[in-house]
A protein has these predicted regions:
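Eukaryotic scaffold repeat domains enriched in small/polar residues
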Residues: 1-241
Length: 241
């Protein structure tokens, strides 16, 4: 079995900017480990501490940390007969979650990638099963739905959006558009402004496993399923123009 600081099944990773802490979710042991980045880089014997044990209460499979009482994340709601993924607020201390109730009428099994921007009071849900993006304010109130050219209210058996990031005043999402069960993964990025207007598409040409926004250097960092595992795009050069 795993030791007290070993990770059984790694989950999401969140960043506490103020404390320079990484919060690493261990789905296997149902806890969050705290790694102080400064100590981790300077102490070869450094071991993480346990930030939170969450037992059987709902917890986000991905989240954006603001403080111990407020994070925004995506949650998987499961029951014997259903599976639904939705976004919402999360209090890490109490375990309380305020989830978005809205589900598009065409969507019976909601699967989403989420991104949030406190600066622009915007939360984005990008649908994995439909060519659909839903924009909310931070209170979870629907602002608009954005339908892409491959929208089909009956579903088309394809995987659509995979990951999302809000980069300044732009929404950047990775997109597949191929068979749900047999595809080569997301290889393109769609770019929208913060209100959901389409701006452009970028063909990366390599499978994008994950992406995030480096605000300090104004660039998108990508993890690729390729010989080159990491790459970045300059926001001003490729996205803003």
């Amino acid at each position: 079995g795993q030791g007290p600081t070993e990770i059984a099944v790694i989950g999401s990773i969140a960043w506490n900017e103020k404390e320079h802490d990484l919060y690493v979710t261990d789905n296997g042991q149902r806890k969050i480990l705290r790694y102080n980045l400064d100590s981790l880089l300077n102490d070869s014997l450094y071991a993480p501490t346990v930030k939170l044990k969450f037992g059987n209460v709902p917890f986000p499979d991905d989240y954006y940390y603001i403080n111990d009482t407020l994070s925004y994340g995506s949650f998987v709601e499961t029951s014997i007969s259903s599976f639904k993924q939705t976004s919402g607020k999360w209090n890490m201390i109490t375990g309380e979650a305020e989830l978005i109730d809205y589900v598009h009428p065409a969507d019976k099994k909601k699967r989403v990638a989420f991104a949030v921007s406190p600066r622009y009071n915007t939360l984005v849900e990008c649908n994995r099963r439909f060519d659909l993006i839903s924009l909310y304010n931070l209170d979870g109130e629907l602002q608009c739905n954005v339908y892409g050219p491959n929208w089909d209210k009956n579903g088309d058996g394809k995987e659509h959006f995979v990951d999302a990031a809000i980069c300044g005043d732009k929404i950047v999402v990775s997109y597949t558009g191929e068979d749900w069960n047999h595809n080569d993964g997301a290889r393109i990025l769609h770019v929208f402004n913060i209100t959901g207007d389409y701006l452009k598409t970028l063909d990366i040409g390599r499978r994008i496993n994950d992406l995030c926004y480096d605000e300090e250097n104004k660039r998108i960092i990508m993890n690729l399923d390729d010989e080159y595992q990491f790459a970045y795009l300059d926001l001003e050069k490729y996205i803003s123009n």
